[in-house]
Structure formats: C-alpha cells, structure tokens
Amino acid sequence: ENVTKGPALVVGNHNAGITFLEPIGLGARWYLEKGLNDTLHFLVHDAMVALPLLRTFLIRTGCVRASHETANKLLQRGKKVVVFPGGNLEAFRPYKNRYKITFGGKKGFIRLALREQVPIVPVVLVGGHETFFVLHDGARIAELLKLKKLVRSETCALFLGLPWGLGFG
C-alpha cells in the first residue's frame, strides 16, 4: 500500500521449495496495484536461471540472477529489488516450521539497503508450505556433498507433494 516511490529492497520469506507460485502471486498483485511504471525485479538462484526454458520465462518476468552486483545496479537505477534471504534453507524448512521465518543468519540485505540508502519493504508470504511436506531438510547431506560451495545450496531436502510426488532438491 504505502510503498515509497523510487528504489527499495523488498525482503520476503521463501516458501514452497522448488515452486515459485508465491513470488508469481506477489509480482501479479504488485502489477495490479502499481502497473508497469514500478515493476519488481526478483533475485533468483543460479540453478533457476541455468535451465533454458525457465530462464526465458524468468527474464521476461523481470527476474535476474541473484548477486550483490546485480542488486546494486538495479537499486542505483531506481528499481525495486526482491530478495528472499532465507534461500533454500527457508524454502525447504520442515513442515512443522512452515510458519517460521528462517533467514539463517543472513544479513547481507541489511548491508545492501544501508549502503545504497534505500528502504526495506517487508513482505510475508504464506501458503506455499501447505502444498508439500518437507520430510527432512538434508542439511547434513548438503554439507557432505559440499553443495553450498558447488551450487549455493545449504539443503538437499526430501519432500512429498503434488505434482512432484516424492522428491529431493
């Protein structure tokens, strides 16, 4: 409602594992309220941008590869940037913690907002964790496989949900 004009860092919690229906819903609602004159730019994980068909869709909807450099450039150009600091750790939190916000100690978004002198707009997304059950976060497996270094992931979760069935990611 009362979001400032000009650049801002929109900070939200990350839900729903490998789906991205909530960010799509946020973007659609923002568009209905603000139109094309004040669009959102979502920072997305490298793995999402690496998939050719998905990359095309993401780019067309204003998404960009998540990096400090990209966020800096967008904010300096007066854009609104959406970040989900909790990343995979939060997206794949156990079902019993579905209503908890888990940023995992990540505070880079605060430093970014201070450095660029832009406001932080908090956003809370709920409902995504109602569509699937994280049976195990797989943090230890991710650590053993060095996934944080290889693909910037702190989890290798085991989950159950539609339409995926039993999966991991």
What are these regions (language model features)?
Residues 73-169:
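Non-catalytic C-terminal accessory region of glycerolipid acyltransferases
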